[in-house]
């Protein structure tokens, strides 16, 4: 099964492009989908109709939109801010439902790249952090259940649900929560990536094609081109195929040193190369 390949429009350059430019470039390269994000749709200032129009323009160019990507940090001691962030996610669900987008991507927080984020165990207790994340995601998932939109938790590095075991704990706490399966983050925690994909076969709503190398607690981890990291691609792809995954797989490009040093911060050629590598990995895995 060859899953349609999309592109997460959230790299350091393309996120600053006008959507029409991203649509044109990705369509010309041969991508089949785009994951739009909170960058292209501001759920504070825009109505769900604005996102529906963006999705319509995307589909007019022959591309689908499998996911709306959000990144609201649910780990905060500010009760007003926490409520605001949960409501942001609920508005994103409403926008996805109106546009016919099947999933919304979320993470728990705290975000490791944000120096202002709380540090669990220092600024906030582990118990408090889990209670906030579970309560917030429960509200969002319950709201989404009535709309047909699935919520896909991404196990982002540094976040509360950053490893296989911690993600499973969150899934146990929020039974209808799905997974946006990004294998790169499980490289950093040393998890058995194909095994977790199999365990979550009924919870995976979307897949990211992204490689990783290094250890989470080190400053030296990075996300290289597909095939250059430690993701066991053949095992992972055959596991997904054998377990019947039938959604989209979106490339998430974060090879920022390569982008800067070799391509003058133009993501077009790295995107083209990533698409070629993804198709090669598909072929080698026989999917």
List each model region and its residues:
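Histidine-acidic metal/acid-base catalytic patches
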Residues: 1-6, 11-30, 138, 146, ...
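N-terminal small/glycine-rich loop or linker at the start of catalytic domains
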Residues: 1-10, 66-76, 112-120
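Active-site acidic/histidine proton-transfer and metal-coordination neighborhood
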Residues: 18-21, 57-60, 78-178, 188, ...
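N-terminal substrate-binding region of glycoside hydrolase catalytic domains
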Residues: 25, 29-46, 69-72
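Residue-level detector of anion-binding/catalytic polar loops
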Residues: 32-33, 64, 102, 150, ...
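Conserved beta-strand positions in the central sheet of alpha/beta enzyme cores
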Residues: 35, 67-69, 105, 152, ...
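Glycine-rich, proline-tolerant flexible connector loops at the mouths of alpha/beta enzymes
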Residues: 35-58, 108-115
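A short acidic, helix-capping loop that chelates divalent metal ions and anchors anionic groups
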Residues: 40-42, 73-78, 113-117, 123, ...
């Amino acid at each position: 099964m060859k899953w349609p390949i999309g592109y997460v429009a959230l790299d350091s350059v393309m996120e600053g492009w006008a959507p029409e430019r991203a649509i044109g470039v990705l369509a010309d390269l041969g991508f089949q989908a785009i994951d739009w994000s909170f960058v292209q749709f501001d759920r504070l200032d825009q109505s769900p109709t604005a996102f529906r129009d963006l999705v319509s323009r995307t589909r007019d160019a022959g591309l689908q939109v499998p996911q709306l990507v959000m990144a609201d940090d649910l780990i905060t001691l500010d009760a007003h801010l926490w409520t605001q962030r949960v409501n942001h996610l609920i508005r994103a669900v409403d926008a996805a439902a109106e546009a016919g987008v099947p999933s919304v991507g979320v993470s728990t927080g705290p975000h490791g790249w944000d120096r202002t984020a709380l540090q669990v165990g220092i600024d906030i207790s582990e118990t408090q952090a889990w209670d906030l994340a579970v309560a917030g995601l429960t509200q969002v998932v319950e709201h989404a259940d009535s709309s047909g939109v699935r919520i896909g938790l991404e196990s982002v590095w540094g976040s509360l649900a950053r490893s296989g075991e911690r993600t499973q704990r969150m899934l146990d706490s929020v039974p209808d929560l799905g997974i946006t399966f990004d294998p790169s983050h499980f490289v950093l925690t040393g998890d058995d990536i194909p095994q977790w994909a199999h365990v979550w076969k009924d919870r995976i709503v979307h897949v990211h094609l992204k490689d990783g190398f290094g250890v989470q607690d080190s400053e030296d981890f990075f996300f290289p081109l597909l095939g250059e990291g430690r993701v066991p691609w053949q095992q992972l792809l055959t596991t997904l195929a054998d377990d019947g995954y039938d959604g989209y797989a979106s490339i998430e490009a974060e090879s920022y040193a390569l982008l800067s040093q070799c391509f003058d911060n133009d993501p077009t050629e790295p995107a083209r190369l990533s698409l070629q590598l993804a198709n090669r990995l598909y072929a080698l895995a026989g999917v």
